[in-house]
Amino acid sequence: MAARNKARKRAFQILFEAEQRGVDPKTAMADWIRLARTDDRQPPVTEYTMQLVEGCEAHAERIDELLSSYSVGWSLDRMPVVDRNVLRLGTYELLWEDDVPDAVVLDEAVQLAKEFSTDESPAFVNGLLARLMELKPTLKR
């Protein structure tokens, strides 16, 4: 598995855990870092994972606003927690990580949805992120 692929997966897991525990993502990430230092079985949290988690947290309000606006028929609180966090990660990477090709962002988000969510989730994630990708030039960051 490529390094960035692993970093995305870990960032998603941290975001998901933070929401489930009701803590901010940086707190959950600090716990992962601490665990990696004491448990050899726990992979380290890479720089790119930290960049993704911190970016999602820094832009959380705008990301959720965009997801709420463009997820037709779905409010954020009705979305499965997995989908919500895959979409948050994908939206952040799509809009704020300019060195990552948009097609890679969509593909990676769909793969996370396939691995961790429902059978319907990959199509939902792909559709919503594709819409944001189309609108990217006009969206205010």
List where the protein language model places each region.
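N-terminal interaction/assembly modules
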Residues: 1-141
